């Protein structure tokens, strides 16, 4: 016995009876009926089951009894579904076996969710309501011309008259034969011979409907739908209505108490509503924001066998039967219909039967507007609100809308996709501190351009994708190292060799290293007293750490500083003293430094935790120093990869650009400092270079020769050694970076420090950290002039990019006072991982500011923000940046593979609080900062009030693509969860209420277009699906008028998109989105 294609299994007691065709059964059941698949989770409503019994027996539903200890709903597992049809009336019904469950697995949840996407209705069929002439004994059945041409086999019009035999089978597999002829005036398609026998046998009357269905084998099937007629009421002596009700309720209560299966029968033509609802559909309805006055649509079957949506308004929310079924969700919405002819529409409906209208404004505002949370990978668009938001918006649901009985890992009230996303995206807890992998000696090419992340092309820090609480525990560095090791499988052999050599020396070095580190840390703690005596050694910086921040950061700075060569220390001290010579506010933080010194004395135990890591690093450095020939052989044997060739092209491009550009003007006030800085630095670099060339890597010296950093970084080194090279590069170039690293807490300092330059994890281009914003603009500008003409292309690249950091500087003194006593600064976002602002250096007068300056975003107004500690002004308009061809998007697009085509899982969305303290405008790197109306509200007073500048807010991922349609709210979808274009069009049509109008792009009045990563406008469906998923940036649904306007204007951006409640920004153009009603957009988002 063959099972139906849709997975419905017949019951075993049917013997060899052939199962009913599922498509024909659903066609006879009606266009709104779709049974859930076997093995899925459903919600059974006993109250609705009793309504079906009452409707079939013509009884009133006002007196349906209840049963003790039977809840108003049961979550059950659907074990089997058997399709039936009455042999006399051909009325269809289904037999279902349900089993109440308290906990369930993920497969059942997925089956329930996938069941909503299955369309069980036939695709090729026609339905006609019979007329009086159709049911007469001599007339025949008149078939509509288009239906006959589509469903019936083609006629041979060479015959006179054209005619053929039609064979069709009904639900009981009975064969019926009709004569199909094309005749009459006017000519029409008729079924003549055999039709009158069919009508009399089935006892059809005018008003009944007949369906012809053609299956996938082109075989015809025949079914009927009977009109709803008054049937004679059964005598109470035959069967009792109350006994029927009590019987079905008792069976459900017994099954619920014992978790045993029970059987029900569902009659789709007699039941007023479905009382076995898929769990996914039920959850989806719960998380819709339903409130009084809300507009909605509801589907109804029409007289011509079609489907129509009726518009209505929610007028009340209450229990249908507050006495017997208190707190039940069955028909708990009172509704009113727009059309006066909708008198036969029900006055009460259930929440899962309606479709809320997607509009930005409501007739009566609901008590809660849903915020635009980031959409997790695999999450449907309408299932985003959490349990507390749902309770606030729907207080009538009480406390039992979730699964109180479910003793499973799925939290009460959470939807299917929310639970799945929590299982898949379980963040790293703050207490979990993973150990560094053993393969720390893996080699890494600094010029590896094979990454999809554009920020890695200039050695920018990778986006921080970990949770905010874990960024202080060094997991980001571990993840970054692991990614680099995975990207270079060719170096596995060399890694193993280095690991073996490292393990031989590790035990010998460990004890000696522990003693030296303790001695050096004690010496450095004593040396910090020099600062209080007013000497020039400002390099011993102390970080302003919050109490909940790990305190090993400053200790590791001390340790690294003690390992710097003397020449490097003197050079950095001289540079820092010259760059900060005019800063009189430096002495105001003496008390803070004393406090930090006391704090560091209590943290000496932190060094012991890092001994294992430090010993491995030192032994690795010695291995590298002892085996220079091996490194050279590896360099010679390695051939240039395509990524290296791309790097060379990029470097040549940079050289050409720098030759065309002139040196930025420098004010006369900075000329003495710049000249003295250049002379001192050149002298110190020569001493450092000569001393390092004479003395190779000494035991315990955690540094590299300075000559290494003046050469193109092509030596294969480990990630830690690369960080050390970058740090010494800062020393040599006179940079005064004190930015925190991945996994370290941000610190605020009073002066540039050499301590953080010696830190292992400091990146040379972490140039938007909080410390750098608080007082290093002068040194950055000076170093730009000194090294503008560096011969090294890579060094020019570092210098040129770092010199263009000029926006978003905050008042250092105010920031220091704000952060010193701020104890809850735990979820700060590393701004350098999210974006960087490039602006030309402009010199202007000093403007003192004593309050937090608002960030200078690229708005329409020409606003200037001045750094309070340096003679530099920073333009707020970013338009001047895009004119620089060096940082234009097309250059990187031509040079870098997959530019702008970064995986969607690394595009981060920043919260409004995080954006409000920094300035992000990067014309060369695509970046999506999230919902634009959050940026629109950047000038709110919330920046100054409540919670401070950095409220506790976790970093969130954005992996979804925006979809816009004029006159509707913008939506966001995850294109990766669709399997093809058909499913995408169907879902978009459902979202925007245009079902059936997007599926056929040739005949539809709507055109689905998208913008790719090159800002080209293309028609959806032309490219292969995989390529479309990788390059789509946004999608627009255009009407025919908008398509004509676009063809005339030649620009998709010229088409107005009014009342877009939430939309994202295009790649690169960070703040280019405007609202016609900003206040309405902001309030809708909040």
From Swiss-Prot:
Residues 454-504, 545-564, 624-647, 659-788 are annotated as: Disordered. It comes from the Eukaryota. It is found in: Nucleus. InterPro entries: ARF_dom, ARF_plant, AUX/IAA_dom, B3_DNA-bd, DNA-bd_pseudobarrel_sf, PB1-like. SMART domains: B3. Keywords: Auxin signaling pathway, DNA-binding, Nucleus, Transcription, Transcription regulation. Residues 486-504, 659-697, 711-724, 772-785 have a biased composition (Low complexity). Its main location: nucleus. Residues 958-1051 form the PB1 domain. CDD domains: B3_DNA. GO terms for biological process: auxin-activated signaling pathway; callus formation; lateral root development; lateral root formation; leaf development; response to auxin; response to ethylene. Disruption phenotype: The arf7-1 arf19-2 double mutant is defective in callus formation. Induction: By auxin and ethylene. GO terms for cellular component: nucleus. Residues 454-485, 700-710, 747-771 have a biased composition (Polar residues). Residues 126-228 bind DNA. One of its GO terms (molecular function) is DNA-binding transcription factor activity. Auxin response factors (ARFs) are transcriptional factors that bind specifically to the DNA sequence 5'-TGTCTC-3' found in the auxin-responsive promoter elements (AuxREs). Could act as transcriptional activator or repressor. Formation of heterodimers with Aux/IAA proteins may alter their ability to modulate early auxin response genes expression. Involved in ethylene responses. Regulates lateral root formation through direct regulation of LBD16 and/or LBD29. Functionally redundant with ARF7. Homodimers and heterodimers. Interacts with the auxin-responsive protein IAA1. Binds to JMJ30. Binds to ATXR2 in the nucleus. Belongs to the ARF family. Interactions between auxin response factors (ARFs) and Aux/IAA proteins occur through their C-terminal dimerization domains III and IV. This is Auxin response factor 19.
């Amino acid at each position: 016995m063959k099972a139906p294609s849709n997975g419905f299994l017949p019951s075993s007691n049917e013997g060899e009876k052939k199962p009913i065709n599922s498509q024909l059964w659903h066609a006879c059941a009606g266009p709104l009926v779709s049974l859930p698949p076997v093995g899925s989770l459903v919600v059974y409503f006993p109250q609705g089951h009793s309504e079906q019994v009452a409707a079939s027996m013509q009884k009133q539903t006002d007196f349906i009894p209840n049963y003790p200890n039977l809840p108003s709903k049961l979550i059950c597992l659907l074990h089997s579904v058997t399709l039936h049809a009455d042999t006399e009336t051909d009325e269809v019904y289904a037999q279902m076996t349900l089993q109440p469950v308290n906990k369930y697995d993920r497969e059942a949840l997925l089956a329930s969710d996938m069941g909503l996407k299955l369309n069980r209705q036939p695709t090729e069929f026609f339905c006609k309501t019979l007329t009086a002439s159709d049911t007469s004994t001599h007339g025949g059945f008149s078939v509509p011309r288009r239906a006959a041409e589509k469903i019936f086999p083609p006629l041979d019009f060479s015959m006179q008259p054209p005619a053929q035999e039609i064979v069709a089978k009904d639900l009981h597999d009975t064969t019926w034969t009709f004569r199909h002829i094309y005749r009459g005036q006017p000519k029409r398609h008729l079924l003549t011979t055999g039709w009158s026998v069919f009508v009399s046998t089935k006892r059809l009357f005018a008003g009944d409907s007949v369906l012809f269905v053609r299956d996938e084998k082109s075989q015809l099937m025949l079914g009927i739908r009977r009109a709803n007629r008054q049937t004679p009421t059964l005598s109470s002596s035959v069967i009792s209505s109350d006994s029927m009700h009590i019987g079905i309720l008792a069976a459900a209560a017994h099954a619920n108490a014992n978790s045993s299966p029970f059987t029900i029968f569902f009659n789709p033509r007699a039941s007023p509503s479905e009382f076995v609802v898929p769990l996914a559909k039920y959850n989806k309805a719960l998380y819709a924001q339903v409130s009084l006055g809300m507009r909605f649509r509801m589907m109804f079957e029409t007289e011509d066998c079609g489907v129509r949506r009726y518009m209505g308004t929610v007028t009340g929310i209450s229990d249908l039967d507050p006495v017997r079924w208190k707190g039940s969700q069955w028909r708990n919405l009172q509704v009113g219909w727009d059309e006066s002819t909708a008198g036969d529409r029900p006055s009460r409906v259930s929440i899962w039967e309606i479709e809320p209208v997607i509009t930005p404004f409501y007739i009566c505002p609901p008590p809660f507007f849903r915020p635009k949370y980031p959409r997790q990978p695999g999450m449907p668009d309408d299932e985003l609100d959490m349990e507390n938001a749902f309770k606030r918006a729907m207080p009538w649901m009480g406390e039992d809308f979730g699964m109180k009985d479910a003793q499973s890992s799925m939290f009460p009230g959470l939807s299917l996709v929310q639970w799945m996303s929590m299982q898949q995206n379980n963040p790293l807890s703050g207490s979990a501190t993973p150990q560094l992998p053993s393969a720390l000696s893996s080699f890494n090419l600094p010029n590896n351009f094979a990454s999809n992340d554009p920020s890695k092309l200039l050695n920018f820090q990778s986006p921080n994708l970990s949770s905010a609480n874990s960024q202080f525990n060094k997991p980001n560095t571990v993840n970054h190292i692991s990614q680099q090791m995975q990207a270079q499988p060719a170096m596995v052999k060399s890694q193993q060799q280095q690991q073996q050599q490292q393990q031989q020396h590790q035990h010998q070095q460990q004890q000696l290293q522990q003693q030296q580190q303790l001695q050096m840390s004690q010496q450095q703690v004593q040396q910090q007293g020099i600062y209080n005596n007013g000497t020039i050694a400002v390099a011993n910086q102390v970080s302003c750490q919050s109490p909940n921040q790990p305190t090993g950061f400053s200790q590791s700075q001390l340790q690294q500083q003690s390992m710097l060569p003397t020449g490097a220390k003197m050079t950095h001290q001289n540079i820092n003293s010259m760059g900060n010579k005019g800063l009189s506010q430096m002495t105001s933080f003496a008390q803070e430094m004393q406090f930090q010194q006391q704090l560091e004395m209590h943290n000496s135990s932190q060094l012991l935790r890092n001994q294992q890591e430090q010993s491995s690093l030192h032994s690795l450095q010695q291995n590298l120093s002892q085996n220079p020939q091996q490194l050279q052989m590896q360099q010679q044997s390695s051939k240039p990869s395509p990524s290296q060739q791309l790097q060379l092209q990029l470097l040549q491009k940079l050289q050409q650009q720098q030759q065309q550009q002139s040196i930025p003007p420098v004010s006369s006030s900075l000329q003495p400092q710049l000249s003295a800085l250049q002379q001192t630095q050149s002298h110190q670099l020569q001493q450092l270079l000569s001393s390092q060339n004479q003395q190779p890597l000494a035991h315990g010296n955690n540094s590299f020769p300075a000559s290494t950093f003046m050469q193109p970084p092509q030596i294969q080194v480990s990630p830690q050694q690369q960080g050390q090279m970058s740090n010494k590069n800062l020393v040599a170039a006179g940079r005064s970076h004190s930015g925190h690293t991945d996994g370290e807490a941000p610190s605020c300092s009073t002066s540039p420090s050499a301590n953080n330059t010696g830190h292992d994890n400091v990146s040379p281009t972490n140039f938007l950290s909080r410390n750098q914003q608080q007082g290093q603009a002068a040194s950055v500008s000076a170093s730009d002039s000194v090294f503008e003409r560096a011969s090294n292309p890579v060094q020019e690249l570092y210098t040129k990019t770092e010199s263009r950091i000029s926006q978003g500087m905050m008042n250092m003194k105010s920031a220091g006072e704000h952060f010193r006593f701020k104890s809850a600064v735990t979820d700060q976002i590393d701004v350098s991982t999210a974006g960087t602002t490039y602006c030309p250096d402009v010199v202007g007068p000093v403007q003192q500011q004593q309050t937090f300056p608002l960030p200078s975003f690229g708005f329409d107004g020409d606003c200037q923000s001045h750094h309070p500690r340096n003679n530099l002004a920073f333009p707020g308009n970013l338009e001047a940046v895009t004119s620089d061809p060096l940082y234009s998007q097309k250059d990187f697009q031509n040079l870098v593979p997959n530019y702008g085509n970064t995986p969607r899982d690394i595009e981060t969305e920043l919260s409004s609080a995080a954006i409000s303290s920094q300035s992000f405008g990067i014309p060369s790197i695509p970046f999506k900062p999230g919902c634009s109306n959050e940026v629109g509200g950047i000038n709110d007073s919330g920046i100054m009030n409540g919670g401070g500048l950095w409220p506790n807010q976790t970093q969130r991922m954005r992996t979804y693509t925006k979809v816009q349609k004029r006159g509707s709210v913008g939506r966001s979808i995850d294109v990766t969860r669709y399997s093809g274009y058909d499913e995408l069009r169907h879902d978009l049509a459902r979202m925007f209420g245009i079902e059936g109008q997007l599926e056929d792009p040739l005949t539809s009045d709507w055109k689905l277009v998208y913008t790719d990563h090159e800002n080209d406008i293309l028609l959806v469906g032309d490219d292969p699906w995989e390529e479309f998923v990788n390059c789509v940036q946004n999608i627009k649904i255009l009407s025919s008028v908008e398509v004509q306007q676009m063809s005339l204007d030649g620009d998709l951006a010229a088409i107005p998109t009014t009342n877009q409640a939430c939309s994202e920004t295009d790649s690169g153009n960070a703040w280019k989105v405007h609202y016609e009603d900003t206040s309405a957009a902001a309030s809708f988002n909040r």
